[in-house]
Amino acid sequence: MAALCNNLRAKLVSWQPVGLFHTGVRLLAADKDLLVKLRKKTGYSFMNCKKALEQCANDFKQAETWLHQQAQKEGWDKASKLQGRKTKEGLVGLLQDGSTSVMVEVNCETDFVARNSKFQQLVQQVAVSTLRHCQSHPENTSSYVKGFLCGDELLQLKADESLKDQLALAIGKLGENMIMKRAAWVKTPSDIFVGSYMHGILMADLPSLTNMTFGKYGALVICKDSDGNLKSNISEIGRRLGQHVVGMNPLLVGSLEDESGGETETKMLAQPFLLEPSLTVGQYLQPRGINVLDFIRFECGEEAESTESTPT
């Protein structure tokens, strides 16, 4: 018995603690300053930004890329789940730059999301991509060029990334089904101008969105100043004509010889002018030397008729 106790005592004296090692990757804690910076730049949650910095050992650029990739994957997953849900809300967006004007429509499920700056940024991305697409077309010095893009065509365009990927990111962030419905663009020579009007204007909160106009109804009116004497008033006349197109919803321009059919008239020049009902649009324009060549009208959520898609 004594020998057994001595043997046990010897083993206890000689025993050394053995360390237990975790074989997984040890994550570095997220740097607080980088966390705040990443959150502010990307708009993702603190938890996701923290996870990104931990995964990327506090490498800011890698963390930003990781966040983007994860959000895109989640966005596509969410987009497939939400596909088919009705998108009757949204915004019409208007962007003009020199001789180029574009108007786009992007739809979502609720007006609440339409008022979110992230959704407005998506509308801006669609407009900018359409603008670049339009500007890539050769100049026509004798007349204007007009084109339309449907939703499938828009998804193939790129801003910094493809609009298809941008759509997935927005769906992932905002949690609603969204569609890029349509876009129209106009490119004009120096003697033709485009009047514009937006109804139901939604004021943007972000300074980066100040070049955009958002609303529920939009119009572009393509005009020619025959006399060349209205340089200072062109913008206001164009705005009034756009307001008429939104309010009276003409179907075609018509001609000065058309007789007015009253309130049911669908030819623009023969309609009572919205802002001066005692005159037709043609009678309002004739003494001012303005010729209306064409117009485009968007109403958010309307059933869009098939429109020409060329030139694209």
From Swiss-Prot:
Q: Which PROSITE patterns match?
A: EF_TS_1 (PS01126), EF_TS_2 (PS01127)
- Keyword Iron-sulfur present in the record's keywords: the answer is no
Any single GO BP term: mitochondrial translational elongation
Major location category of this protein: mitochondrion
Q: Which GO terms describe its molecular function?
A: translation elongation factor activity
Report the InterPro entries cross-referenced here. Answer: EF-Ts_dimer_sf (IPR036402), Transl_elong_EFTs/EF1B (IPR001816), Transl_elong_EFTs/EF1B_dimer (IPR014039), Transl_elong_Ts_CS (IPR018101), UBA-like_sf (IPR009060)
Q: Where in the cell is it found?
A: Mitochondrion
Q: Which CDD domains match?
A: UBA_EF-Ts
Keyword Chloroplast listed? The answer is no
Looking up PANTHER family in the UniProt record yields: ELONGATION FACTOR TS, ELONGATION FACTOR TS, MITOCHONDRIAL
A Pfam family per the record: EF_TS
Please give the function described in this protein's UniProt entry: Associates with the EF-Tu.GDP complex and induces the exchange of GDP to GTP. It remains bound to the aminoacyl-tRNA.EF-Tu.GTP complex up to the GTP hydrolysis stage on the ribosome.
Q: Quote the cellular component terms of the Gene Ontology held in the record.
A: mitochondrion
Q: What organism is this sequence from?
A: Xenopus laevis (African clawed frog)
Signal peptide start-end? none
Q: What else is known?
A: This protein may be expected to contain an N-terminal transit peptide but none has been predicted.
Could you say which protein family the record assigns here?
Answer: Belongs to the EF-Ts family.
What keywords is this UniProt entry annotated with?
Elongation factor, Mitochondrion, Protein biosynthesis
Q: Write down the superkingdom of origin.
A: Eukaryota
Official protein name in the record: Elongation factor Ts, mitochondrial
